[in-house]
Design a protein with these regions (language model features):
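Double-stranded beta-helix
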Residues: 1-27, 104-136
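A short glycine-rich, His/Asp/Glu-containing loop-to-beta-strand
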Residues: 23-64, 119
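A structural signal for the main folded, soluble domain(s) of proteins
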Residues: 36-39, 73, 92, 100
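A short, compositionally biased micro-patch
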Residues: 50, 62, 69, 94-96, ...
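A generic "binding-loop/recognition-motif" signal
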Residues: 53, 62-63, 81, 97-98, ...
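Glycine- and acidic-residue-biased ligand/ion/polar-headgroup-sensing regions
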Residues: 61-80
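Short acidic-glycine-tyrosine-enriched beta hairpin
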Residues: 79-98
């Protein structure tokens, strides 16, 4: 049976199916993300942030992002500005802008993140502060 799985994965790789080599769901200390759709210059994720948790204070050199809150209440730092976003509200994050999302409530936060740029790898991140001890 494991040989059959390997053959299936090899077939998927041969026709360039991204799921053959990339996980669509990623787990992080603050919650998780699920890649809903992606192309050469865009990626759409659903992101869940646990109560009391936050993403790194970070910036990206090769992509802009748009965050739409679809559940809960998020606190967003965008440069020196702090925004409080509720369900249905959104924020645009230009390339190289310092930003962070926090969930300061007792309820989950869900957002849709749309990334736009010429490179969308998870390694396009400069962490300026990270409460989980992840490197810059």
């Amino acid at each position: 049976e494991s040989q059959s799985i390997k053959q299936t994965v090899d077939q998927l790789k041969s026709i360039s199916i991204p799921e053959a080599t990339q996980h669509r769901k990623g787990y992080r200390p603050w919650g998780w993300y699920d890649v809903l759709e992606e192309g050469d210059t865009f990626k759409v994720k659903r992101i869940y942030v646990k109560p009391g948790e936050s993403l790194s204070l970070q910036r990206h050199s090769r992509r802009a992002e748009h965050w739409l809150v679809i559940g809960g209440e998020a606190t967003v730092q965008l440069g020196e500005t702090v925004l409080h976003l509720s369900t249905g509200e959104s924020v645009y994050i230009p390339k190289r802008e310092i930003h962070r999302l926090k969930n300061e409530t007792q309820n989950p936060v869900y957002i849709i993140e749309t990334q736009i740029g010429d490179y969308l790898g998870e390694d396009d991140i400069e962490r300026l502060e990270d409460i989980y001890g992840r490197g810059k």
